[in-house]
Amino acid sequence: MKVKMKTKRGAAKRFKKTANGFKRKQAFKRHILTKKSPKRIRQLRGTKLVHVADVAAVRRMCPYI
């Protein structure tokens, strides 16, 4: 019997698989927002796709999602 790979639980909570790749939330939006401009805070809204260079690492961390 082959041993299953473990999923990195922290990564599984941070990334979701979509048809176009892996979806992630924007960083730098939790605290110390007073010194950031409204434009910058507005642009940090929503989700982005994981960069092509990082997709392989996310796949290794989350083999079953």
UniProtKB/Swiss-Prot annotation:
Any single Gene Ontology cellular-component annotation: cytosolic large ribosomal subunit
UniProt name for this protein: Large ribosomal subunit protein bL35
PANTHER family according to UniProt: 54S RIBOSOMAL PROTEIN BL35M (PTHR33343), LARGE RIBOSOMAL SUBUNIT PROTEIN BL35M (PTHR33343:SF1)
InterPro entries in the record: Ribosomal_bL35, Ribosomal_bL35-like, Ribosomal_bL35_CS, Ribosomal_bL35_sf
Any GO MF annotation of the entry: structural constituent of ribosome
Originating organism: Psychrobacter sp. (strain PRwf-1)
UniProt GO BP: translation
Pfam families xref list: Ribosomal_L35p
Keywords: Ribonucleoprotein, Ribosomal protein
Keyword Ribosomal protein: yes
Family (UniProt): Belongs to the bacterial ribosomal protein bL35 family.
